[in-house]
């Protein structure tokens, strides 16, 4: 049950062997970048699901990765919290961060992606630029999925 700040500092000091002062400076910078600097001393029980997810993003960014993998980052969130996490991810994309995102948030995928891969049964069914895949999918299964999605949206 570490604070948000310690959650971002510890991986840097343990894995990267960064000096604690530098790790803290980097952690605070990234907590600020995801709108969580005011919660640096908060513990998990004091944070909403969306806030916890943003701390997790700050922790990952504190390690200064080349790529970040997001596996359904909004699936366990209340609907009200989804937007705040997607907004942080959108800013990351705009900053040039390479992200691999597994998501059912189709509007987000269409708006933010350079490349989209549609998987069906664990196999790549179709891939392409968002305009191609969402605008004129080639595979029947992709068309079926997207038509269902568009009806629900």
List where the protein language model places each region.
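Conserved ABC ATPase signature
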Residues: 43-47, 51
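Catalytic Walker B motif of ABC-type/P-loop ATPase nucleotide-binding domains
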Residues: 68-71
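Helix N-cap at the start of a conserved alpha-helix in ABC-type nucleotide-binding domains
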Residues: 79-81
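H-loop/switch region of ABC-family ATPase nucleotide-binding domains
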Residues: 103-104
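ABC ATPase "signature
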Residues: 127-128
């Amino acid at each position: 049950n570490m604070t948000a700040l310690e959650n971002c500092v510890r991986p840097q000091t343990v894995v990267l062997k960064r000096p604690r002062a530098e790790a803290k400076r980097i952690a605070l910078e990234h907590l600020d970048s995801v709108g969580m600097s005011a919660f640096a001393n908060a513990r998990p029980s004091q944070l909403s699901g969306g806030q916890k997810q943003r701390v997790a993003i700050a922790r990952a960014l504190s390690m200064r990765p080349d790529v970040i993998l997001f596996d359904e980052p909004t699936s366990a969130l209340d609907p009200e919290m989804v937007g705040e996490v997607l907004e942080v991810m959108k800013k990351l994309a705009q900053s040039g961060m390479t992200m691999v995102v597994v998501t059912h948030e189709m509007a987000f995928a269409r708006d933010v992606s350079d490349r989209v891969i549609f998987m069906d049964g664990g196999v790549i069914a179709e891939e392409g630029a968002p305009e191609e895949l969402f605008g004129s999918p080639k595979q029947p299964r992709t068309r079926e999925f997207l038509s269902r999605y568009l009806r629900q949206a």
